[in-house]
């Protein structure tokens, strides 16, 4: 009964899955592309989505033997996949705002999981280079596909066991 009540409460709240969320800290760290009144959170709080929006998550797996070059190749593939995913904006059954928001920002969520296994992925300079590469790859492929460049490209998602499963 307790679990059933928990699920009902989650459903009727309209907020999605529960969690601990510090709104003050989130507002201090919100991206510039978000107006104060628009910013809130959702189950993907680290992406800073608009209401009625989602991103195109893709993951590159960092391994102990990766070099900056091998991680750049992995991030490039993940970015291309995310950019292609961003072309899919036909959402029957959802309000038109979903399509509008997703087409305007074409958000990607290129994630690098397995960071603790890789010295390169722990290096701030390498991470900056990987982010810059992802942004450039998205820009190039968005132009080829005739869509907007993503307003945001990279993220760090809590990946759980995906780094083990995606070996």
Give short role names for the model-derived ranges:
Residues 2-6, 56, 70-73, 126-129, ...:
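Exposed alpha-helical structural elements
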Residues 7, 33-35, 133-135, 166:
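Short glycine-cluster motifs
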Residues 10, 151-167:
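Active-site and channel-lining beta-strand-loop segments
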Residues 2-5, 36-45, 136, 145-147:
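Short amphipathic alpha-helical surface micro-motifs
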């Amino acid at each position: 009964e307790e679990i059933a009540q928990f699920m009902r409460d989650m459903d009727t709240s309209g907020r999605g899955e529960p969690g601990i969320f510090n709104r003050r800290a989130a507002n201090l760290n919100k991206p510039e592309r978000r107006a104060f009144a628009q910013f809130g959170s959702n189950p993907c709080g680290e992406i800073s989505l608009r209401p009625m929006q989602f991103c195109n998550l893709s993951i590159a797996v960092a391994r102990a033997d990766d070099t900056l070059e091998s991680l750049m190749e992995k991030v490039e593939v993940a970015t291309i996949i995310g950019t292609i995913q961003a072309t899919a904006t036909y959402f029957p059954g959802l309000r038109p705002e979903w399509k509008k928001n997703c087409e305007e920002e074409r958000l990607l969520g290129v994630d690098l999981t397995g960071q603790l296994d890789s010295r390169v992925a722990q290096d701030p300079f390498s991470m900056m280079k990987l982010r810059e590469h992802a942004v450039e790859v998205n820009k190039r492929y968005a132009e080829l596909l005739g869509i907007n460049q993503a307003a945001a490209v990279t993220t760090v998602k809590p990946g759980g066991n995906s780094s083990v499963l995606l070996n």
